[in-house]
A protein has these predicted regions:
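Active-site gating loops and adjacent loop-to-helix segments of metal-dependent hydrolytic enzymes
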Residues: 75-78, 82-98, 147-168, 178-181, ...
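Active-site core of metal-dependent hydrolases
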Residues: 181-296, 304-305
Length: 473
């Protein structure tokens, strides 16, 4: 299984310029200047992709998705559906990190690990956290440390809720112990050992996180607070934390205007721009979707409108806003969903277009619309709007000739009336005149010699038509 992508503009995420990129099986094996790798000499099975006018980025990493579904806070009817590989990859996501949220009972770690394994077997890359909102943490084994050490897919703990009415209202000691155990599991297994922390609306904001960093030996690298753009106060506190070296995770939105105007969230592109202007390290910011999580929607008057569902589609949408609205360079914007989460979560072989890395790639056009998505070396999505398949061409041609057929049938009937009233000769003579006229029209339209169904009907003198009904000898 080989792919050769030629003459494509590479953002790795740093801008490399025009390159030829060769993948074999699930790895990137060669990146050379455009025109350096010839298609000659490769096996006939090698797929050659013309990258002229297109961009190549790493596959996207969505580091916070409720892959088992979320919600249930308004009752069982509000439980949201599970994520699917197709539903993730069509938005460019080739790597996903699953988590449990408010509900750690109806959904548990056995189901989460099984779902994660399933996504891996289907052809993308998937990891997960152990636990949910609650402390004590509900683990798969009997401890956080053992979960991280012994379960390959588990890379940390989360999403642990603080500063939220739905949290377990953990004490400082309880929260610090969770972070410490998670770090130990990471140290012993060579994983990130990171705690994904859900931040709520409470004005306490990051208080527990800041105390752990200030009062213990645990570094900021072990904690990733998410939903930091929930409100202005939380955003400002999170920016202070990021200026100290902490990593922060923005939650993207599909309906960006709604969440900014009605819910007073900080727009992701504006938040990233403000952090960059303040001097925050661009490598310490990520964007995730909170995918499949339930999103209650309210009007400006506070009226409940319904329950939405988080979608990974927001990742690329937020990147576009960063590039086109706030003029953040593409290499910085795209790093928030590629190299940054890969580095922070220590996902080996992920997040970069680099020799030896996994062949997880996104091909985009100049407007940053997805053209093709490659996961583990396999094409998992093609934008039919940009790449028309052979079947689509045949279908389109069939529809065209069907329409043409109907057009000439109608034209024949109209001509029948015209000829009947202008000529008083016999019926067969009129039919011959119609056929001659129709052939002239067809030739003028450059369809001379093309057999169209309508003309077979014209040759059938037994056909029921207006001319035969009204003609009288």
């Amino acid at each position: 299984m080989m792919k050769l992508i030629q003459n494509i503009d590479v953002y790795a995420p740093q801008h490399l310029g025009k390159k030829d990129v060769l993948t074999i099986n699930d790895k990137i094996v060669k990146i050379k200047d455009a025109g350096s790798i010839s298609a000659e000499g490769f096996l006939s099975e090698t797929e050659i992709i013309n990258g002229e006018g297109l961009l190549l980025t790493p596959g996207f990493i969505d580091s916070h998705v409720h892959v088992l579904g979320g919600g249930g806070e308004g009752g069982f009817a509000n439980r949201t559906p599970e994520a699917t590989m197709e539903g993730l990859t069509k938005f460019g996501v080739t790597t996903v990190v699953g988590c449990l949220g408010t509900d750690g009972i109806g959904r548990d770690m056995c189901a989460l690990v099984a779902k994660t394994k399933g996504l891996n077997e289907q052809g993308m890359s998937a990891y997960c956290y152990t636990g949910s909102y609650q402390i004590p943490v509900r683990t798969l084994t009997d401890s956080i440390v053992k979960d991280i050490m012994m379960i390959q897919e588990i890379i940390g703990t989360g999403e642990i809720a603080i500063s939220d009415h739905r949290s377990s209202q953990p004490t400082f000691e309880e929260f610090a112990r969770v972070v410490a155990d998670t770090r130990l599991g990471g140290v012993l297994s060579g994983k990130a050992g990171i705690v994904n922390v859900h931040l709520g609306d409470s004005p306490r904001c990051l208080d527990l996180i800041e105390r752990v960093v200030d009062e213990t030996e645990i570094p900021t690298s072990q904690i990733l607070p998410t939903h930091i753009n929930r409100n202005e106060l939380l955003f400002c506190k999170s920016m202070e934390y990021a200026l100290k070296g902490g990593a922060v995770d923005f939650t993207g939105n599909e309906d960006i205007d709604y969440w900014e105007t009605i819910c007073d969230e900080v727009r992701v592109c504006n938040g990233i721009k403000r952090m960059l202007d303040a001097g925050v390290n661009p490598n310490r910011m990520t964007i995730s979707s909170d995918g499949q999580g339930s999103l209650p929607m309210y009007s400006s008057d506070g009226e409940f409108l319904g329950m939405g569902v988080g979608q990974s589609s927001c990742l690329l949408k937020e990147v576009k806003e960063c590039v086109f609205k706030t003029e953040i360079p593409l290499e910085i914007a795209i790093s928030t969903i590629t190299s940054n989460p890969a580095d922070i979560l220590r996902l080996k072989g992920k997040g970069k277009v680099e020799e030896g890395y996994d062949a997880d790639l996104c091909i985009l056009d100049q407007e940053l619309q997805l053209v093709e998505v490659i996961a583990k070396g396999n094409t998992v999505y093609k934008n039919k709007g940009n790449l028309m398949s052979e079947a689509s061409v045949i279908q389109l041609a069939g529809a065209f000739f069907t329409t043409l057929n109907l057009f000439f049938r109608a034209l024949y009937d109209i001509m029948g009336f015209v000829v009947f009233y202008r000529h008083k000769n016999g019926y067969k003579e009129n039919v011959l005149l119609i056929n001659q006229t129709a052939k002239k029209i067809l030739k003028a339209l450059s369809f001379d010699g093309v057999e169209v169904e309508a003309f077979r009907h014209m040759a059938d003198l037994k056909r029921l038509d207006p001319m035969k009904i009204f003609y009288k000898k």
